[in-house]
Design a protein with these regions (language model features):
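Active-site metal-binding loops of divalent metal-dependent hydrolases
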Residues: 16, 113-115
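Short beta-strand-to-loop element that shapes/binds the nucleotide-sugar donor at the catalytic cleft/hinge
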Residues: 133-149
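Hydrophobic packing residues within well-ordered alpha-helices of enzyme cores
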Residues: 20, 66-70, 225
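A phosphate-binding catalytic loop at a beta-strand-loop-alpha-helix junction
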Residues: 7-23
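Conserved N-terminal catalytic core of the sugar/cofactor nucleotidyltransferase
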Residues: 1-11, 33, 37-112, 121, ...
Length: 232
């Protein structure tokens, strides 16, 4: 079936950032800077460069700072809509589900606001027979991997181990269709059960990306990233 590019994108920005404390006691994690630029601003600019101007950002912890910094997105060539989750974040599944009215019609991309990558968003697509598409990355030293990849489809960790295939880490970039969230209800819920359902049905495609990628999850990783020479 023909592949489609995402028509909109959501940047996940509502989390408390517990592992990044004390930095996140006063600054939301997506506004932490790598080489002088907030993580979320880099994602926004790269999405717009890839032709995705319709952007949704979910907010909870210190969300007002993100809104104040990015405003309506005009200066970036974007049209930003904010999805409020206060007083606390709805987890990944609940956060995206609440934002569906702003993202429809799909397909749409979802990007973790606390990652750093040079992934080329202009190449991101999803084929017609799938309801989800995950970008996987080689495992960093601090992770063992949660998913396998076989013939362009993502496998659960259990299935990958059973088949003896290599494990990879979710790279914080995905594409979804509305059908992926069938049966979900507004509230707090993780996205993993929906991934597992999609994988079991053979509806979750994937790709491996081996370029620049870092989960900026701790102060030590942030310091290391800022100390590194990065040209992207």
């Amino acid at each position: 079936m023909a592949s489609e590019r995402p028509r909109a994108a959501m940047i996940m920005a509502a989390g408390r950032g517990e592992r990044m404390r004390p930095l996140t006691d006063t600054t939301p994690k997506p506004l932490l800077r790598v080489h002088g630029q907030p993580l979320i601003e880099r994602h926004l600019e790269r999405l717009v460069h890839a032709g995705i101007q319709r952007i949704v950002i979910n907010l909870a912890w210190l969300g007002g700072q993100i809104r104040d910094y990015l405003a309506d997105g005009t200066r970036y060539g974007a049209a930003i809509t904010y999805s409020e989750e206060a007083p606390s974040a709805l987890d990944a599944g609940g956060g995206v589900f609440r934002a569906l009215p702003y993202l429809s019609p799909g397909p749409f991309a979802v990007v973790n606001g606390d990652s750093y990558t040079d992934f080329p968003f202009e190449t991101l697509t999803i084929a017609g027979q799938y309801d989800s598409h995950l970008v996987l990355v080689p495992n960093p030293a601090y992770l063992q991997g949660d998913f396998g990849l076989a013939r362009g489809e993502v496998l659960t960790r259990g299935e990958a181990l059973a088949r003896g295939t290599e494990l990879f880490t979710f790279g914080g970039i995905a594409v979804y269709r509305n059908a992926f969230f069938a049966g979900a209800q507004d509230g707090v819920f993780p996205i993993m059960p929906l991934w597992q359902r999609s994988m079991a049905a053979g509806k979750c495609s994937g790709q491996l990306y081996s370029g620049v990628w870092e989960d900026v999850g701790t102060p030590e990783r942030l310091d290391a990233l800022n100390a590194a020479r990065i040209t992207t």
